[in-house]
Curated annotation (Swiss-Prot):
Domains as described in the record: The C-terminal domain of this protein is probably involved in association of subunits consequent on ribitol binding.
Residues covered by the HTH lacI-type domain: 1-61
DNA-binding region, residue intervals: 6-25
UniProt protein name: Ribitol operon repressor
Designated gene of the protein: rbtR
Biological role stated in the UniProt entry: Repressor for the genes of the ribitol operon. Binds D-ribulose as an inducer.
Record keyword Coiled coil present: no
Lineage: Bacteria, Pseudomonadati, Pseudomonadota, Gammaproteobacteria, Enterobacterales
SUPFAM superfamilies xrefs: lambda repressor-like DNA-binding domains (SSF47413), Periplasmic binding protein-like I (SSF53822)
PANTHER family: CATABOLITE REPRESSOR_ACTIVATOR, LACI-RELATED TRANSCRIPTIONAL REPRESSOR
Keyword DNA-binding among record annotations: yes
The entry's keywords: DNA-binding, Repressor, Transcription, Transcription regulation
GO molecular function terms attached to this record: DNA-binding transcription factor activity; transcription cis-regulatory region binding
């Protein structure tokens, strides 16, 4: 079966090949082509099963209309919702989204970004990257703009959550509930993730500030969990929390991984 070309579509539509190309590439408004004609050509192209030659289009426009994103985890609801919304917004703008999971491994992050750049993506979104500045430097060398999401960098624009403000509000709520139920105030036990990352550090700073504002001493009920493997979480929780189970009045956890560790390690008494 003969492959349909732009010239075939032009003959079927009764317009020039350049007009067909402009319509299929989304540039028909700039050429002052009517919406009615654009709709007609698009319909004929769909009926004929025509597929745009992206490589040829990219050579002409120097744009691939592809946007790449790296994320650290697929099984995390936070990153999963980010990926889903990213795809929706990309398609709304006529872009093809490419997403890959790098599992917070620096070598996978760099490998993924290099692969995206080799396919000449127009943008790279680095979500939760371990070294966002290294990714930004690679993209800058290739002339590709990048943005950091979730974890900030210094070489590209960054969009992050207000972990500090959220932790202040949450700590206030937990303390208020504890005082109402027990009739007295008591410090919380803080269980954080990796201490060097921005989210646990911000949450810890905000929570200790809020606890102090209630007139409570910030006792050393602080546990940093060095890894997210279940065995590590279970061991850390058993050794650090079992001795305090009688006096603990509440917990403040940064993410779901410490919560999994708390449940796995302290199942006997939680």
């Amino acid at each position: 079966m003969k492959k349909i070309t732009i010239y075939d579509l032009a003959e079927l539509s009764g317009v020039s090949a350049s007009a067909v190309s402009a319509i299929l590439n989304g540039n028909w408004k700039k050429r002052r082509i009517s919406a009615k004609l654009a709709e007609k050509v698009t319909r004929i192209a769909e009926e004929q099963g025509y597929a745009i030659n992206r490589q040829a289009s990219m050579l002409r426009s120097k744009k691939s209309h592809v946007i790449g994103m790296i994320i650290p985890k697929y099984d995390n609801r936070y990153f999963g919702s980010i990926a889903e919304r990213f795809e929706e917004m990309a398609r709304e703008r006529g872009l093809l989204p490419i997403i890959t999971c790098t599992r917070r491994r620096p070598e996978l992050e760099i490998e993924a970004v290099k692969a995206m750049l080799s396919w000449q993506v127009d943008w790279v979104v680095a979500t939760g990257a371990t070294n966002p500045d290294k990714i930004s430097a690679l993209c800058q060398q290739a002339g590709v703009p990048t943005v950091n999401l979730d974890l900030p960098g210094s070489l590209s624009p960054s969009v992050i959550s207000d972990n500090y403000g959220g932790a202040k509000a949450l700590t206030h709520k937990i303390l208020a509930n504890s005082a109402r139920r027990r009739g007295e105030l008591a410090p919380l036990t803080f269980i954080g993730g990796r201490r060097a990352t921005i989210t646990p550090a911000s949450v810890y700073a905000a929570s200790t500030m809020r606890i102090a504002s209630w007139g409570l001493a910030c006792r050393r009920r602080i546990f940093w969990l060095p890894a997210i493997r279940k065995a590590t979480l279970r061991t850390a929780c058993r050794s650090g929390l079992a001795a305090r189970r009688r006096c603990c009045r509440g917990y403040l956890l940064t993410r779901r991984y410490p919560w999994k560790g708390l449940c796995a390690g302290c199942r006997r008494w939680v």
